[in-house]
Amino acid sequence: MRAVVQRVDKAIVKVNDRIVSDISKGMLVFLGIEKGDDFSDADFLLEKVINLRIFEDEEGKMNRSLSDISGEMLVVSQFTLLGDCRKGRRPSFTSAEDPERSNILYSHFINQASERIPVVKSGIFQAMMKVSLVNDGPVTMLLDSKRLF
């Protein structure tokens, strides 16, 4: 399971020009589910995301987590994070999990996050979305439950 985590001042998800989710200060999490991922991958990644100290303290150091700042989380499914571009010019998505299983793990991630963070919102699974954000920093982190990077 892979995540791109961005520290944001705000983020908005639209589907068919309609706002379906928006957050203020917090994290935008793009989540990609890989074949073979299970609930332990989702739980590991969620623990990392929630406790990732990417928010500044009084001295300007990245020393605070999402919980510490009472920040909000927006989770967006993105199977293209599993794209393999090593051969040719067209990405291969063969390592991405099938939609039915992905939706189960995506929903699990969101449900578990909702139990620990007061404001958790999400995009619409498998929808074509327009995501707008105001990066804070910018600060962008890449996470992988297989600890590949």
Curated annotation (Swiss-Prot):
Concerning its family, UniProt says: Belongs to the DTD family.
Predominant subcellular localization, coarse grouping? cytoplasm
Location of the motif Gly-cisPro motif, important for rejection of L-amino acids: 137-138
Q: Where in the cell is it found?
A: Cytoplasm
How does it associate, per the subunit comment? Answer: Homodimer.
Entry domain remark: A Gly-cisPro motif from one monomer fits into the active site of the other monomer to allow specific chiral rejection of L-amino acids.
HAMAP family with a match to the protein in the record: Deacylase_Dtd
Q: What is its EC number?
A: 3.1.1.96
Q: Give the top-rank taxon of the lineage listed in the UniProt record for this protein.
A: Bacteria
- Name the job this protein performs: An aminoacyl-tRNA editing enzyme that deacylates mischarged D-aminoacyl-tRNAs. Also deacylates mischarged glycyl-tRNA(Ala), protecting cells against glycine mischarging by AlaRS. Acts via tRNA-based rather than protein-based catalysis; rejects L-amino acids rather than detecting D-amino acids in the active site. By recycling D-aminoacyl-tRNA to D-amino acids and free tRNA molecules, this enzyme counteracts the toxicity associated with the formation of D-aminoacyl-tRNA entities in vivo and helps enforce protein L-homochirality.
Name of the protein described by the UniProt record: D-aminoacyl-tRNA deacylase
Q: Which GO terms describe its molecular function?
A: D-tyrosyl-tRNA(Tyr) deacylase activity; Gly-tRNA(Ala) deacylase activity; Ser(Gly)-tRNA(Ala) hydrolase activity; tRNA binding
Which PANTHER family does the record associate with it?
D-AMINOACYL-TRNA DEACYLASE 1, D-TYROSYL-TRNA TYR DEACYLASE
Q: Which reactions does this protein catalyse?
A: glycyl-tRNA(Ala) + H2O = tRNA(Ala) + glycine + H(+); a D-aminoacyl-tRNA + H2O = a tRNA + a D-alpha-amino acid + H(+)
GO BP, one annotated term: D-amino acid catabolic process
Kindly state which keywords UniProt assigns to this record, in alphabetical order: Cytoplasm, Hydrolase, RNA-binding, tRNA-binding
